[in-house]
Amino acid sequence: MDDVAGFSVAEFEAAMDRAVERSETVEFYGHKPGVTVPVDKLEAIVAAADERGLPFVLYSDFAHGEGNGPGVALSLDDNSVSLWDDIRPMLRQYNAHLTFFVSRYTRLSDDQKATLKDFLNDGHELQPHSINHLREPEYVEDRGLAALMNEEVLPSIDALRADGYPAEAFAYPFGARTSEIDEEILKHVGVLRSLSFPYGFPVEDACP
């Protein structure tokens, strides 16, 4: 949904129309409301889903073998807690439920974590997105798969679970993955989220 991807609201609407026709769930993701994705664009996407009667699917639904469609799975990544909190009234207006894939969770303040906990009251969920938001295939090449799991993946899962979140899905930073990493992480969560991009799309780190 970020503007850098170059997709218009009309293109998101067309994707939702295809989801209705094919009885599929379409996945949209972004980062910082009001920064990387304009709030009015995000609201237009949410409103379009509501107008089409598309259920809002969470990634925990996928982990449980549900949410196959038609539906729309919306997610925001990283740790822009205050920006996410700002859009909660808009999301409530449409009864929209999002998955927030959180990176650097262990570095958040107690106040930020308390704000995230409040998101559950609106039907949203938190899922892990790694500790340091690194390109995981490169990490494995440099340090090995065990180091990736022990230093980046499992601590992000365990930190959320320690605070009461089930942590049933994992989103790859930059969407970068390999089948070897998939196999290892799937021992600990039920579903993975990677990404696909149009040819030539620049994948940049939207984290602070």
Locate each region found by the language model.
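N-terminal pre-catalytic segment of deacetylase/amide-hydrolase enzymes
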Residues: 1-74, 116
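Metal-dependent polysaccharide deacetylase catalytic core of the NodB/CE4 family, i.e.
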Residues: 1, 24-35, 69-72, 82, ...
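A short acidic, amphipathic alpha-helical/loop segment
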Residues: 15, 41-45, 86-90, 114-115, ...
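A generic secondary-structure signal
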Residues: 14-18, 48, 90, 155, ...
